[in-house]
Amino acid sequence: MRHRKSGRKLNRNSSHRQAMFRNMAVSLLEHEAIKTTLPKAKELRRVAEPLITLAKEDSVANRRLAFDRTRSKEMVGKLFNELGPRYQERPGGYIRILKMGFRAGDNAPMAYVELVDRPELVDADEE
């Protein structure tokens, strides 16, 4: 029976799934927006949001936990210096998932995952 077993398998073994979500979380935090399939996007929320919550309180222990989960020194720096202070007043819900139709090749439902309250990029044409 499958009672109370949360999370999606996504046809991968556990180490592959863990590595995939670690990489996706780092990409999302680095670029602040990524495009992926809808089930992966919904599962990514469970990985990325706790990292931002962790970054709201800067301590050596929290930085080490974040490094353990991302394996990227640059991302730990960005989390604690930029993203943590940005979301200090927000009690969760740091990620927005927008549905964006279906992929051409296999008709998989696609989604655009972005951080809320991210700074808008200004085009050079508008200046």
Swiss-Prot record:
Assembly: Part of the 50S ribosomal subunit. Contacts protein L32.
InterPro entries attached to this UniProt entry: Ribosomal_bL17, Ribosomal_bL17_CS, Ribosomal_bL17_sf
GO cellular component: cytosolic large ribosomal subunit
Keywords: Ribonucleoprotein, Ribosomal protein
Listed GO biological process terms: translation
Keyword hit for Ribonucleoprotein: yes
GO molecular function: structural constituent of ribosome
Gene: rplQ
Protein name, entry field: Large ribosomal subunit protein bL17
Superkingdom of origin organism: Bacteria
Pfam families: Ribosomal_L17
UniProt family annotation: Belongs to the bacterial ribosomal protein bL17 family.
